[in-house]
């Protein structure tokens, strides 16, 4: 009951202070207008059991700097103006980190988070955000890029702008991989713009707008924009628009060439084609 009383006391002080400031600014510190403004605010608030309901009003939280993100290349972040749901403890589990919480204008849920920027949505636990306008969930994840998102999973890192990771663990999108994405899997890496990895483990997309779907230890190289690897193990697409479809230790090194399965098959010419040893064995 004591905590509830304290909460309502703090709310009342905040409302009175805010209303007094607005009234003095607009009405020359007229106490009558101040009282009317306060009554108008309180009309939006009702208590239902243990719930404070705000109906018909906006809840506006700001940090007092006068701007949301940056102005004249100076950050608006000053550690206040955040909406924090829950206890926001410094510690979750056995760890006792020193957390940087200089951020402002963020929505924060869960414990053990570090937030230094503005305009982010943070949930889960033990996540770190230094990039603006990010969304982060899961646990032990980090975002330093602008407008990027980690939607679930653990121990992911995004350095690029406008990149995304959905699920899995220990996946990384590096700084040059703007608009890159990883969907699930483990220890996958994206290095180039618009590149993507879907599932699998230890796959690396170096080619611009290249894609790897499943499998393990597969790679598209820096000289292979628009290349594709689908499944298999230790396969490599090393030329523009080249494709490897499954198998092991296959390489598509000719432009727009295809290797369809098999073991240690390779292409070198434009539009070349190779397949596994069980069919088209003489090609």
Give the ranges of each region predicted by the language model.
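Bacterial N-terminal signal peptides that target proteins for export
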Residues: 1-9
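N-terminal signal peptide c-region/cleavage motif recognized by signal peptidases
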Residues: 17-20
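Boundary of Sec targeting at the N-terminus
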Residues: 23-25
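Periodic small-residue-enriched repeat registers in elongated scaffold domains
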Residues: 29-283
